[in-house]
């Protein structure tokens, strides 16, 4: 095959790969599985409690976010009040700490009143979306921990954005 033709074939394949990746990351399917390397795997349908499979290995040192389902509604701003469903696990042992899904009622609060990891990780998310947050201790509960969360614990949250005001 001539060199120019081969280059064109690779260019077309690259464009198709990017288009496919863009479609699937922009909410092409409400049942989402998989994650970026090193992050927890999150599965489940929109409107239902997620299933989280924590990864093994060292926790990331910086805040990590990943849209599992991309919402199409109102965007979260730093000044927003949110209504969300969430699930919280600890990185160190994969223990479920808390889930609003268990009580059946979502939580409502001003974004300015929660941990730094949420304040920095949720703006830009939209109603109808599901976002994974992996929050290092310095943006969570720090060296003291809080209740069942131990000192210097990395937190895994999956947050479904229900309403923004």
Tell what function each PLM region has.
Residues 1-165:
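Cross-family detector of peptidyl-prolyl cis-trans isomerase
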